[in-house]
Amino acid sequence: MGQKHGVDTRGKGAEFCGCWEILTEFINGSSASFDDLPDDCLAIISSFTSTPRDAFLAALVSKSFGLQFNSDSVWEKFLPPPDYVSLLPKSRVFSSKKELYFALCDPFPNHNGKMSFRLDKASGKKCVMLSAKKLLISRVVNPKYWKWISIPESRFDEVPELLNIDSFDIRGVLNTRIISPGTHYSAYIVYTKTSHFNGFQTSPIQAGVGFQRHGMSKTFIRFDSKKRQDGWMEAKIGDFYNEGGLIGFNLIEVSVVDVARYPHMNMKSGLIIEGIEFRPKDSR
């Protein structure tokens, strides 16, 4: 390995210029490898890393990049506030900030098991799911229409199974302070079907999302077979932009409603509701 170059440390701008000169040598065909880059140059490069995806890919470039981009100093800036991290079980111990970050990418419950949280792996943005118990579901307390069950596939203790109903109406409200500001979000209803699934194929199911008292963007959805990585299915309700911090724009409303003129003529059954998820647009 050749001798490592030095970088001018008289100021941030000078450091960057010195680092850029060294990188230019590599770009122009220098025989040196990325492992020859000095530590202070690697530190400057890592300081410009803006997303977890960037850090993960950069760590694959070389051994030196791996050491730098897997360091706690890089991954700590992707972690949410301490009160968010404190939601993880106290018994869990993490050997690095990167390990802690990826633990937060798996859903974990909060609000007495009525919500779940996780981070989007690529961006570090917050994802939230409202459980069925956090939603307003028409006649869900009546055992004639809905039955609460426990299934291993669910992240929640109980989920409602639709037995038979004419009026299908699900609504929810999310405080946008618990999701990431300055982010485009999508809302999805997460569900699965039973062998008794029926009635939805011919029912006009209208879904809407929008800020409270500011109107909803509405569309029609179908409970088709689009599967998620966790085995559930989902139907997109709509998109919104969370500006963050604006008075009067802190509550998002969602709805999934059968708007048939005569819903009693088309009974519906065979649906299990996991919840409504809010996640950054185009993420999975």
From Swiss-Prot:
What GO molecular function annotation could you give as one example from this UniProt entry? carbohydrate binding
Q: Where is the F-box domain?
A: 32-80
Source domain of life is: Eukaryota
What's the short name of a Pfam family annotated to this entry? PP2
What InterPro entries would the database entry show? F-box-like_dom_sf, PP2-like
CDD domains linked to this entry: F-box_AtSKIP3-like (cd22162)
Per its record, how is this protein called by name? Answer: F-box protein PP2-B5
Q: Which organism is it from?
A: Arabidopsis thaliana (Mouse-ear cress)
